């Protein structure tokens, strides 16, 4: 009736049966390695053409529930007219990460007055961006997202300069801990210019689970959640320039907007 259960350091499932007299208790146990966490494709959405919905991804010691947003949806709009459809990918990405850590955050709460940007950057920096005309406003930079996450109690490691091989290995290893990675894509398959997305985890088929706030008909029916190998994603990412690697710009600039953020790293 008293004692400890010891498991081997490997993943898998087993059945534990306990008997006491005529009573029998049978439990199915799942052993999870905290450095090899994956999510079965069968549990992930096959259709994600919604304005706002939740994706559940395995983590350690529990699962994480992420809310994924469509940046062009009126339900997710900012107080700044048309900002979210044009520039809202970063705000959506920040909100998605925060929801996975138990915080009830929407993109609007990221951008609006007295919101997360305002509190993390200060009134002067926030106002300078949003008083501009729409075409001159900028999305939050990865540096800015990093600052928002830290300001809300989430540890991060912002990697600004990288080689493709090193980044691929580091991102895969990090995703296997059950924690997300925020990335910036350049113009091409994933973006019309620059675009911020969140890698939520890895599937049992080895693909990254991607939360993408933008509509992409090339992926079929404008899905919010997409799946791609990390090695292919790396081809569309970019590092900060040497001069931009020390930038403290909270809003996007192409020289300082690159890299990726490891969220909740094992520091």
State each model region's role.
Residues 32-137, 187, 222-228, 235:
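Active-site-adjacent structural segments surrounding the nucleophilic cysteine of cysteine proteases
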Residues 1-36:
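Extracytoplasmic soluble-region selector
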Residues 129-158:
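Mid-length scaffold segments of soluble, non-membrane domains
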Residues 82-91, 135-142, 164, 168, ...:
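Solvent-exposed, acidic/flexible segments
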Residues 23-27, 154, 195-197:
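Short beta-strand segments
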């Amino acid at each position: 009736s008293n004692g400890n259960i010891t498991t081997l350091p490997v993943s898998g499932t087993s059945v534990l049966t306990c008997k006491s007299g005529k009573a029998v208790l049978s439990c199915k146990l799942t052993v999870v390695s905290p450095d090899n966490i994956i999510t079965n494709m069968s549990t992930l959405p096959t259709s994600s053409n919604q304005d706002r919905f939740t994706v559940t991804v395995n983590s350690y010691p529990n699962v994480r529930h992420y809310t994924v947003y469509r940046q062009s949806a009126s339900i997710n709009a900012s107080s700044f007219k048309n900002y979210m459809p044009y520039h809202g990918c970063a705000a959506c990405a920040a909100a998605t990460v925060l929801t996975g850590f138990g915080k009830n955050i929407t993109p609007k709460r990221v951008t609006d007055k007295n919101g997360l940007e305002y509190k993390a950057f200060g009134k002067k920096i926030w106002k300078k961006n949003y008083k501009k005309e729409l075409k001159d406003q900028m999305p939050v930079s990865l540096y800015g997202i990093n600052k928002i996450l830290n300001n809300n109690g989430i540890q991060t490691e912002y990697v600004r300069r990288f080689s493709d091989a090193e980044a691929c290995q580091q991102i895969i290893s990090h995703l296997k801990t059950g924690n997300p990675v925020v990335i910036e894509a350049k113009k091409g398959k994933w973006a019309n210019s620059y675009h911020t997305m969140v890698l939520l985890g890895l599937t049992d088929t080895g693909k990254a689970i991607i939360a993408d706030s933008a509509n992409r008909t090339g992926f079929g029916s404008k899905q919010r959640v997409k799946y791609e190998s990390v090695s292919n994603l790396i081809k569309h990412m970019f590092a900060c320039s040497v001069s931009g690697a020390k930038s403290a710009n909270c809003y996007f600039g192409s020289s300082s907007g690159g890299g990726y953020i490891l969220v909740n790293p094992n520091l």
